[in-house]
Swiss-Prot record:
GO terms for cellular component: host cell endoplasmic reticulum-Golgi intermediate compartment; virion component. Pfam families: v110 (PF01639). Keywords: Early protein, Glycoprotein, Signal, Virion. It comes from the Viruses. The keyword Glycoprotein applies. This is Protein MGF 110-4L. InterPro entries: ASFV_fam_110. Induction: Expressed in the early phase of the viral replicative cycle. It comes from African swine fever virus (strain Badajoz 1971 Vero-adapted) (Ba71V).
Length: 124
């Protein structure tokens, strides 16, 4: 009975958050989340490479138009994300994980912002 209740709760959380309910609301670990979920994933971990489109060393955020252009550097990390019921996980591949309730997300951007270099025209 508890399992059924938790399953229903997980599906409801996905609907509230606007996340697709594919495969019962689960998302296997991937470094390429579905396009329609980028808004969610990139809000809480903006340094993931899949959130940025880079050309010639200059990167533009795919989701947030107000983000400044940045220089491609170590700020961008290779992330994998996954979702199992109401647990959303970011893995940076170096043993660092950020786990949060999908319905109560907590940004994990601060540690990476220190390495971000905003693009200035003089950088060319």
């Amino acid at each position: 009975m508890l399992v059924i209740f938790l399953g229903i709760l997980g599906l409801l959380a996905n609907q509230v958050l606007g996340l697709p309910t594919q495969a019962g609301g689960h998302l296997r670990s991937t470094d390429n989340p579905p396009q329609e979920e980028l808004g969610y994933w990139c809000t809480y971990m903006e340094s993931c490479k899949f959130c940025w489109e880079c050309a010639h060393g200059i990167c533009k955020n795919k989701v947030n138009e107000s983000m400044p252009l940045i220089i491609e550097n170590s700020y961008l990390t290779s992330c994998e994300v996954s979702r199992w019921y109401n647990q959303c996980t970011y893995s940076e591949g170096n043993g660092h994980y950020h786990v949060m309730d999908c319905s109560n997300p907590v940004p994990h951007n601060r540690p990476h912002r220190l390495g971000r270099k905003i693009y200035e025209k003089e950088d060319l």
